[in-house]
Amino acid sequence: MPIKTRVLVVDDSALMRGLLSQMINLAPDMEVVGAAPDAQSAREMIKVLNPDVLTLDVQMPKMDGLEFLERLMRLRPMPVVMVSSFTEAGSDTTLKALELGAIDFIGKPRADGGRSVENYAEELVEKIRAAKAARLRRAMTGNSVRAATPASASPKSGLGASGKIIFVGASTGGTEAIKDFLLGIPADCPPILIVQHMPEAFTASFARRLDSLCAPRIIEAKGNEKVEPGTIYVAPGHSHLLIRRGTAGFLTELAATPPVNRHRPAVDVLFDSAATLVGRKAIGVILTGMGKDGAQGLLRMRQAGARTFGQDESSCVVYGMPREAFLIGAVEEQCSLDEMARRVLGAVSA
C-alpha cells in the first residue's frame, strides 16, 4: 500500500481547519495527521507527528504565520503551503512568506460562489503534492537586494534599443525565481512581458514588490499600453496577457477568455502571441513551475526563430514546466537561475 503524504493543518479557525482537513483527506494519497489552532500547538505537533507538508494560515493570534514560518525555516525546514485571505494586506504578507521559503500559496475558500468546492479542493491537493516534491529554497539573507544586481545591469547598457522583446512564464516557485532573474536585468532593458500563475488579488502586489527591488520599471499590465524598453509588464490574475501590433509598435492586450491549461493567465497564450507577431525578435524564458503550461508555446516561439531558455532541474523549486518544454525540444539552452539573466542578455545583444 502506497505511503500517504502526511499533512498538518495550521489555522486559528476551527471551521477552516475542519474544511481543509476534509478536502485533503478525500485525496487517496494524503492524510491529515493533525490540526493546530496556533503556532505553539503546531510546533509541538511537528515534533510528535513529523508531517511531510504544512498548510499554514497567514494571520494567526499570538505568533502570526510569518514569524512562525521564519522560525520553522531556520530550525526545521519543511514544505509549507500558505493559506491566505484575498486582501491587499494578505497578498503582501503571502509574498513575504514565499520570500521566507514557503513553496506556494492558496487563497482561503470563499462563500461568494467564485469557484466550486471541488475545484478549490483539487487545487489545494495539487499544491500539497507539488510542495512535497519541491526543493526547499534558502530564504534570502539581510543583504541589500539592489546591491546584488551585477555590473552588467548598469543604467546605460544600450540593450533597450535592440528591438528584442523578452517573454517569461513561471508557476510554482516563480515569484522568487522571477525576482532573482530580474535582479540581473538593467534599467534600460528590452520590454519584458511576464505570466506568473497567480490569483487576481495578488498580481498587483507582486508587480509593486518587483518594482521596489529591481532596476527596470515594473507594472501590472492594464491592456493597450505601448510596449516600451525599460518597462516590464506583469499579467493580471484575471486575464490572459498577449502582445499585439499597433500603428506605432507593439501594445499589450488582455483577454478574459477561458483558461488554457487550466490557467488564466496562461503562459502558452503569451508565448503563442510572441511566436506569431514577434518571431525572431522574441526571446522566451520558462522558469520553475508545476505542469506543462508554456511548453507548446515556447516550442512555437523556437520554430518561429526566437531564442529560448529553460531553467535547469537543479535550480527549480518544481521542475515541471521547464522539463516539459525541454522534452519536446522547445528549449534551446538550459541553465541555472543564477546564469539566466546573463544568458538572456547575451541573446539580446547577439
Curated annotation (Swiss-Prot):
Q: Which InterPro entries match?
A: CheB-like, CheB_C, CheY-like_superfamily, Sig_transdc_resp-reg_Me-estase, Sig_transdc_resp-reg_receiver
Where found? Cytoplasm
Output the Pfam families linked to this UniProt entry.
Answer: CheB_methylest, Response_reg
Identify the enzyme class: hydrolase
- The record places domain Response regulatory at 6-123
Q: What is known of its domains?
A: Contains a C-terminal catalytic domain, and an N-terminal region which modulates catalytic activity.
The name of this protein is Protein-glutamate methylesterase/protein-glutamine glutaminase 1
What species is given as this protein's source?
Dechloromonas aromatica (strain RCB)
The taxonomy runs: Bacteria, Pseudomonadati, Pseudomonadota, Betaproteobacteria, Rhodocyclales
